[in-house]
C-alpha cells in the first residue's frame, strides 16, 4: 500500500477508486487495527464519510486520518 495525502484521496474517491483510511498513530502492519475501505456508496461525499470515521475514532489512535491506496 502507498500512503497519500487528503487532496489526492479526495480526487481518487471522486473518480471511484478504492481508498483505505487508518488513524494516523497506527502503523500500517498493525495486527489489531486494519485499514478501513471507503468507496462511493449511495452518493455519500468524501467529507461525510471521513467526518463520520473521525468522530468515532478513539483519540489514543490519533486525531487525524492517514490515507492509502493499493500499489
Predicted segments, located by residue:
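Mixed-charge, Lys/Arg-rich low-complexity intrinsically disordered regions
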Residues: 1-15
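Acidic, low-complexity, intrinsically disordered interaction modules
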Residues: 19-70
